[in-house]
């Protein structure tokens, strides 16, 4: 099983990952339990890797965003960003396509979304009807420039490991290119492809596979120290 880190400093980084052969074709409302499973969190090791990777280029990043956040202002800044994301994405949240969560322990925001809303089965081309959602997210990201954006894409276990990994990476590139056209600062952005390696639910059922075909968009504050 292979996991890749894609660092793409000249493009943007929202990653949609999906099943190789079995994305949901019909949209349905997700239950509260299913939404909770989609929200989830990456493991401590994975989040630590994100932070460590960003810290290696922290000096250039702070300069590029005009200085880092400090003190109590960090929590307030991220709270406001979470509220604006929730406000902008209310239709998608009501349909069960997107969730937004604020983690108080590290001031991280997690935007989770179902893969089927962004791509058709086996496709790496964004659905035209989904670009308005991406526009909303890009608008908020541009309003809150003192953050980094790390996107982790996931698939279910249908298909080979290699196919699922490649599919997630190609879908990442499609969204990265879209966000680049929306002027999100490239130095803030990176993406990981996880393929099928981190399921949130049982791949033995269609409901579980639908939950595993997801995207986790992590937004972290740029700290001055």
Where are these regions (language model features)?
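Bacterial N-terminal signal peptides that target proteins for export
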Residues: 1-8
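C-terminal motif of bacterial Sec signal peptides marking the signal peptidase cleavage site
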Residues: 14-18
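Short, low-complexity, glycine-enriched hydrophobic/amphipathic alpha-helices that associate
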Residues: 22-84
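Extracytoplasmic/secreted proteins, especially bacterial periplasmic and envelope-associated proteins
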Residues: 37-38, 45, 60, 64, ...
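Amphipathic, membrane-active segments
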Residues: 79-108
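Extracytoplasmic
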Residues: 95-97, 104-108, 114, 121, ...
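Periplasmic peptidoglycan-binding/anchoring modules of Gram-negative envelope and division proteins
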Residues: 118-153, 180, 210-212, 217-220, ...
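Periplasmic OmpA-like peptidoglycan-binding domain that tethers envelope proteins to the cell wall
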Residues: 154-225
């Amino acid at each position: 099983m292979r996991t890749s880190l894609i660092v793409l400093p000249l493009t943007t980084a929202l990653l949609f990952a999906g099943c190789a052969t079995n994305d949901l074709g019909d949209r349905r409302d997700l239950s509260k339990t299913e939404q909770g499973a989609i929200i989830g969190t990456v493991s401590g090791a994975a989040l630590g890797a994100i932070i460590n990777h960003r810290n290696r280029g922290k000096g250039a990043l702070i300069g590029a965003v005009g200085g880092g956040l400090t003190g109590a202002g960090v929590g307030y800044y991220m709270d406001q960003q979470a509220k604006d994301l929730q406000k902008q994405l209310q239709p998608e949240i009501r349909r069960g396509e997107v969730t937004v969560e604020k983690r108080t322990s590290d001031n991280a925001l997690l935007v989770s979304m179902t893969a089927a809303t962004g791509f058709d089965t086996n496709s790496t081309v964004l659905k035209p009807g989904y670009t308005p959602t991406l526009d909303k997210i890009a608008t908020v990201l541009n309003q809150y420039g003192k953050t980094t954006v790390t996107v982790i894409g996931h698939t279910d276990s249908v298909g080979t490991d290699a196919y699922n990994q490649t599919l997630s990476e190609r879908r990442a590139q499609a969204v990265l290119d879209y966000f680049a056209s929306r002027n999100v600062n490239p130095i803030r952005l990176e993406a990981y492809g996880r393929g099928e390696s981190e399921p949130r639910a049982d791949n033995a059922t269609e409901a579980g596979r639908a939950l595993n075909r997801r995207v986790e968009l992590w937004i972290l504050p740029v700290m001055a120290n």
